[in-house]
Curated annotation (Swiss-Prot):
It comes from Mesomycoplasma hyopneumoniae (strain 7448). Its EC number is 2.7.4.3. GO terms for cellular component: cytoplasm. Its main location: cytoplasm. ATP binds at residues 14-19, 127, 136-137, 199. Residues 126-163 are annotated as: LID. Coiled coil: none annotated. The gene is adk. This is Adenylate kinase. It comes from the Bacteria.
């Protein structure tokens, strides 16, 4: 089954948008455009770029818009026009939204995953990542099959620096402050749907599929 829909997920860190995206990407042959994944890939390939933005990432701050905009736009240019995709983690600011509109990055539907702060902290404190392939796991929602090793390459799993409780709280505050005008814009466009991210991932996916 293939979809050509252009989809945006809006949700705080820990809302499940990355995991949900991967489920839909596999089922509907969509391209997953995660700013986090794009940055990690670029950092692993370009030491000069890594040095430039490492301070932002380690403190939980957003990278300057011009850097994020270029990274996302360069990636989208490589995607065929009839190919569906999921934007995950972009746009996060009004400046990024304006860049999207100006550069013709169009969307068919927007899903806003609403979740309580205490649930976010609980979920993120249980996140683990593979250092080699960047696959993510969650001890609450998506456990690795082999203890604390990656299912794909048996590499030891780690906790990211920005998943520490004090940084999580900072990330939640920044997200809440930046997301309101973006949500208001898409509300006026009539393409935004609100989802309860407190429910299971399976229940959330079933709701999303009603609009695909």
């Amino acid at each position: 089954m293939k979809s050509n829909k252009k989809i945006l997920f809006i949700g705080a860190p820990g809302s499940g948008k990355g995991t949900i995206s991967k489920i839909l990407v596999e089922k509907y042959k969509l391209v997953h455009i995660s700013t986090g994944d794009l940055f990690r890939k670029k950092i692993s390939e370009d030491s000069q770029f890594a040095a430039q933005i490492q301070n932002y990432l380690s403190s939980g701050s957003y990278v300057p818009d011009e850097i994020t905009n270029k990274l996302v736009a360069d990636f989208i240019k490589k995607i065929p026009k009839n190919q569906g995709y999921i934007l995950d983690g972009y746009p996060r600011t009004l400046q990024q939204l304006e860049f999207m509109i100006k550069n013709g990055i169009n969307l068919d539907c927007v899903f806003y995953l609403k979740i309580k702060n205490e649930t976010i902290i609980s979920r993120l404190s249980q996140r683990l990542f593979c250092q080699k392939c960047q696959k993510s796991y969650n001890l609450l929602l998506a456990k690795p099959k082999n203890g604390l090793k990656c299912d794909l390459d048996n590499t030891d799993l780690i906790t990211r620096n920005d998943d520490r409780p004090e940084i999580i709280t900072h990330r939640i505050e920044k997200f809440n402050n930046s997301v309101i005008p973006i949500v208001e814009f898409f509300k006026k466009s009539g393409i935004i749907y609100y989802l309860d991210a407190e429910q299971t991932l399976e229940e959330t996916v079933i709701e999303i599929e009603k609009w695909l």
